[in-house]
Amino acid sequence: NNTMYEMACFGNKLYVVNGGAWASQYKRPGCIMILQDNKWHNVTDEQVKKQIADDPFLDCMNVVQDPQDANHYFVTTYGTGLFEMQGDKVLNHFMSDNSTLTTAAPLYPKNYTRCVGAQIDSKGTLWAVVGGENGPPLVYKKRDGEWGSICQFCDVYDGGILPVVYLKS
């Protein structure tokens, strides 16, 4: 895959994802490209879809690696939710029905759960920014699995809400 959207480096691993955001989705089949020890390894949409009952895996936005486990990471997507991964294996596929992620179109949550970015703080809490008008734009998942959401760090702009996220390492 030669389409690249964002990259992130954690230790000796470089992650590259191929998604993107637009008013809707680009509907690019998801691909996580990992460079480690001068070797590329891809996790493709076909591999992921086999593990999640053929739910869509499209428009990957970013990757954040667990600071306590170099093979554990999360992938955000613009439309198909948040994926928790261990190597090539999908551990969890989070959507509006099993997390505090919200969907921009409640009738079509599998296509409009827009998780546009994520970070993990020093306590191991995953923070994610959600792109949609039907709920809080900032959600979190604690290490123990507890989900929550907040909106205290938000500014209203032109009828929409813009989250402002600052995480100290």
Model-assigned labels for residue ranges:
Residues 1-169:
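Carboxylate-rich, polar loop motifs that coordinate divalent cations or form catalytic acidic clusters
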